[in-house]
């Protein structure tokens, strides 16, 4: 599974995504559930549409799928997701996103694609933070107690990294001060982390030895 990990929005490697379209296809599924931390309304909808438009401008044919529509319908969701080879997971609240991935079975679906080089997981902010093995340290910048789905906070991430990502570091972003606080907290508590400035993109893949 190829990974395109951005601090904010598309980031500074759009040519990588354009190359993906040329070599594969332009279908992409946008996952918006980190935004379930916010109430439904025009502002939330407009934000999701703005993310979708950025992908459209690159040449993608975007389908927005809310994992919330498939809670306790894991088989149905898996069948739908099989028609996509690329996903874009947007920013919001990491803990809410993790819960949505669990309740819908999206996390288990990803596991079936780990060794597939023709599968792309792209995302930014919460969409990359959720990839860590353990989410402790992210609670400084994301509220872990927000509970839109009625289940307990999940501190285990997807398990692809043994450190957390801290996006928006030293950036022109409203959360950059919270990221500074997160860095301080992680240093104090010996939590491993990697900072990204807005614009930064990390390219990686999961076809390697992973510690669960």
Locate the predicted segments by residue.
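C-terminal and late-domain segments of enzyme folds
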Residues: 1-24, 34-46, 54, 137-212
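Short, well-ordered alpha-helix to beta-strand connector turns
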Residues: 25, 59, 83-84, 161-162
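Short glycine-rich anion-binding loops that position phosphate/pyrophosphate groups of nucleotides
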Residues: 34-36, 92-95, 126-127, 170
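Flexible gly/pro-rich beta->alpha loop and the following alpha-helix that scaffold active-site loops
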Residues: 62-119
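Class I SAM-dependent methyltransferase SAM-binding "motif I" and its flanking Rossmann-like core
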Residues: 99-102, 107-116, 120-169
């Amino acid at each position: 599974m190829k990974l395109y990990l951005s601090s904010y929005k598309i980031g500074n490697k759009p040519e990588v995504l354009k190359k993906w379209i040329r070599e594969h296809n332009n279908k992409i599924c946008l996952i918006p559930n980190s935004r379930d931390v916010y109430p439904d309304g025009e502002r939330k909808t407009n934000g999701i549409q703005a993310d979708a438009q950025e992908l459209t401008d690159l040449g993608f044919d975007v389908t927005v799928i809310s994992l919330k529509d498939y809670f306790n319908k894991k088989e149905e969701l898996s069948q739908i997701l099989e028609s996509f080879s690329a996903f874009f997971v947007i920013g919001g609240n990491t803990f809410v996103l993790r819960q949505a991935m669990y309740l819908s079975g999206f996390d288990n679906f990803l596991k079936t694609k780990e060794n597939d080089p023709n599968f792309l997981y792209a995302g930014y902010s919460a969409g990359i933070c959720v990839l860590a093995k353990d989410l402790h340290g992210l609670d400084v910048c994301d509220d872990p107690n927000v509970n839109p789905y009625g289940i307990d906070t999940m501190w285990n991430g997807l398990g692809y990294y043994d450190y957390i990502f801290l996006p928006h570091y030293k950036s022109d972003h409203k959360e950059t001060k919270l990221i500074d606080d997160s860095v301080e907290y992680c240093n104090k508590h010996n939590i491993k982390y990697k900072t990204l400035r807005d614009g930064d993109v990390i390219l990686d893949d999961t076809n390697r030895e992973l510690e669960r």
